[in-house]
Structure formats: structure tokens, C-alpha cells
Design a protein with these regions (language model features):
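Active-site core of glycosidic bond-cleaving carbohydrate-active enzymes
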Residues: 1-196
Length: 196
């Protein structure tokens, strides 16, 4: 089928699937380096399964039921601030929709192209749907840099996020450090670097 169906209301099916797709992409890259072209092709194709979850109505990823239909009723903001969310772990559709690091340009095409992608991504920040304490969306500020002429957005947002969410106080990082994830994000960002 190419997707993980939703078995129960709060089963994290979309979150799990997205991690599988990133792993499949990594396996395709490894297989290619090993000269296993058929395996590389298989894993690369599987890594594109995220497209099954894309819902044009909302412009986000959306859980799919066992029957192969989009989950209803659906609110892409449900699950904000770590509240339970259908299909997503510790987040919502906005925290996960852009979590396709291996196919950013493919996701942009699904969304209608560069302008639509950039506008929608900017709205994630403008409307308070970005969660700096949640790993799936911590790369979001850097996605603007993938598109020529939009790099300034990355520079502006990273500067603002560092000033707002990272301090020298005991609670100076958003959420918890999750084995160094948040502090590493801050250090890379302060240096003006971000691993791709």
C-alpha cells in the first residue's frame, strides 16, 4: 500500500511512516553506493510513500484509515503542545508535514510549487504552529534555504528563535534536550551551519 494505516485514534501511524521513509531513503543511498541498483530503486520508491498522506484539502499530511481513506474528522492543529493527536506522536500535522528531508522539492511540487511551499511554511511560523521543542520540525527554519531567494527567511527566523527560546537560565532550552538535540540545534545555528 505504501502507507501505515491508522489502527486506533492515537496510534502515531503517520509519524512512524515518515521515519520509515527516511530510513528507506538512507538504505537506498547505501544500496546505491554498494552497487545494488535494484535494491536502491526499491528503497527509493518506498521512501516516496509520504505522498500517500498528502491531503490537498488542508495542504498537510493526514492519517489514512485501514479502509484507505483519509481520517475524519481532521484538524491539522490537533495535537499542539504535545496533546494527543490522531496519527502523530507528540505533535500535529503542522509539526510533521515538512518532515520529508529526503524529498523537499517533491513535497513542494505536491503543494503547488515553490511559492505555495514557501508561503505555507512561513504560515507555520506566523500562525504559531512551529514547535521548537519537537524534533520533527526543528529543521523547518532551514527549509527556506533550499529555495533561491528565500534564504533571508532562514537567517531571520533562526536569529529570532535563538533569542526567544535559548537562554543561559536553567530552563534555557525549549522542552528537554533529548540527548543533546536542542542544544546541538542551538550550537549549529549560532555558528551559521546546519547539517543537511
Amino acid at each position: 500500500k505504501g502507507y501505515v494505516p491508522m489502527e486506533s485514534q492515537y496510534d502515531n501511524s503517520v509519524s512512524h511512516a515518515l521515519e520509515y521513509y527516511v530510513a528507506d531513503y538512507a538504505l537506498s543511498t547505501l544500496a546505491e553506493e554498494l552497487g545494488k541498483k535494484e535494491d536502491a530503486k526499491l528503497f527509493r520508491k518506498r521512501s516516496m510513500g509520504y505522498k500517500n498522506y498528502f491531503c490537498k484539502e488542508f495542504g498537510t499530511l493526514r492519517p489514512i484509515t485501514k479502509e484507505g481513506r483519509f481520517y475524519e474528522p481532521f484538524d491539522p492543529k490537533e495535537g499542539a503542545n504535545f496533546a494527543p493527536s490522531p496519527g502523530f506522536h507528540e505533535g500535529n500535522a503542522w509539526n510533521y508535514t515538512y518532515y520529508v528531508p529526503h524529498d523537499v522539492y517533491g513535497l513542494a511540487r505536491l503543494m503547488g510549487g515553490k511559492k505555495s511551499f514557501v508561503d505555507k511554511l512561513q504560515s507555520v511560523f506566523d500562525e504559531g504552529n512551529y514547535d521548537p521543542a519537537n524534533e520533527p520540525d526543528i529543521a523547518y527554519p532551514y527549509l527556506f534555504s533550499r529555495f533561491k531567494g528565500e534564504e533571508w527567511r532562514t537567517q531571520k527566523l533562526v536569529k529570532e528563535l535563538l533569542a526567544k527560546h535559548f537562554t543561559t537560565k536553567p530552563d534555557g532550552i525549549p522542552g528537554n534536550d533529548d540527548t543533546g538535540t536542542m542544544s546541538t540545534w542551538a550550537i549549529f545555528s549560532m555558528m551559521g551551519l546546519y547539517p543537511d
